[in-house]
Amino acid sequence: MGQKFSIKCKKQSKNKNTSKCQKIPKKAYEGPPGSYMVKAKYKYAASGDTDISFEEKEIMYVLEQFDEFWLKVVKQKDNKEGLVPSNYVSKQDGSPQSVEAWREIQRWEAEKSLMKIGLQKGTYIIRPSRKENSYALSVRDFDEKKKICIVKHFQIKTLQDEKGISYSVNIRNFPNILTLIQFYEKNGIGNTHIPLTDPMPDNYQPPVHFQDIEINRENIEILNEIGRGFFGSVHRAKWGRSYEVAAKMLQSSKAEREKFVLEAKIMHKLRHRKIVELLGVCTEPQDMPMLIIVEYMKNGSLKEYLKTPDGKKTNLNQMVHMMAEISEGMAYLESEKVVHRDLRADNILVANDLTRKVADFGLTELTDGSLGDQEKKTLRFPYKWTAPEAAKSKVFTSKSDVWSYGIVMFEILTWASSPYPDIPAKEVIEKVSKGYRMPNPEKFITGVCCPDEIYKIMIWCWDANPEKRPTFLVLQEKMDLLIVDTLTNNAYYSHSK
């Protein structure tokens, strides 16, 4: 629906029959009563009878919240009604989250993105800030003296009074974020008056969450096998008409299926950009393998990636970024009381944009980590990654995951070398229980660089007392600080215009 006009005419004089007509714009269409406007962040192709397709930037009006992950909308351009995934649209309410430039990322990720070759000066991102009641505007600039690209950050304060919410940069106030952007597009920002040009291109497309945890098997087309492990085989698959997913095939009894579905309903609600999200399960018919449907990561595991020609070029700064992404995903799981139990480079997957995501936590229990007596007898675990107290008691906690994270750090620093290379797997638990710890890997693996500040974090993760180990939130903060240090030194990101 475009903007409508009415014709208003008035006579120019009482002696003339001619009149002057003006087009007077009517009030912009605001959608059905009780609805609110959203704009599509991505293109979407419908996969069933109840959802509808739409184009990027298309305007729709939300009629109701259908469930936790889907909205019922009517499209502005053709009045079609149907369901759309809520994470594919943004509410047009003047907030930072409503504009194209919004990214749910940290400062170092904004700097990494904005320093990519080919972007013009003034490319920008709006993101969360660690400062209270604030957001951040990150802008690409060019230092003419040093001849390097840099990123500048500006605080956007949120103000609230009887008139509502407004936003402030320095001492200038704006009624909404769009007005703020338009002002700095025209006038420039900062001491050097950098004009905002374009939002940072967004190559990430989030997974589409199924409307129900239980998926009709007929809607899943199994394609080629891409992996096999202790829990079963993993296949590339297609959901509906166009969406690639990964399907894990598990053989299980009826009782095991019922138990897993209960756990899956909890895991289905876990949403974070640094974890591989569980999209649904297929448990029927009973005589066929159970399917666990998750995001498809075409680059495979981090272990596989580090062994590729591109992976072998990974430098120390990039390795620290990997560690930071994993700690962020694990910090989220920790906050949700989820214990992984099998954190390894094999269970970190690499997305299309090379983002690293924590995977396979969905095959673990979600409570306090305790198992039944019979389960403890048959439980298998990777000796070289498992904390000694967990190996002995079969009780896994977030702190035993932290131990495993220290081993993952070793894997990353050594391009996926096997930990404890000279010790048989079944002897590792006994040796570490007696106080043995792997030395700094740069001392026994050629070409490895592991600064003392990184090795100290590894040793901290391997403290014999679980309570003295850091939390994942603390580890995330430590990794962020390491990245900020490297950025300050221009060790990785500086390049010519």
Curated annotation (Swiss-Prot):
Start and end residues of each SH2 domain: 100-200
InterPro entries from the UniProt entry: Kinase-like_dom_sf, Non-receptor_tyrosine_kinases, Prot_kinase_dom, Protein_kinase_ATP_BS, Ser-Thr/Tyr_kinase_cat_dom, SH2, SH2_dom_sf, SH3-like_dom_sf
Ranges for domain Protein kinase: 220-482
The entry's keywords: ATP-binding, Kinase, Nucleotide-binding, Phosphoprotein, SH2 domain, SH3 domain, Transferase, Tyrosine-protein kinase
SH3 domain boundaries: 33-94
Enzyme Commission code: 2.7.10.2
GO molecular function: ATP binding; non-membrane spanning protein tyrosine kinase activity
Protein name: Tyrosine-protein kinase SPK-1
Organism of provenance: Girardia tigrina
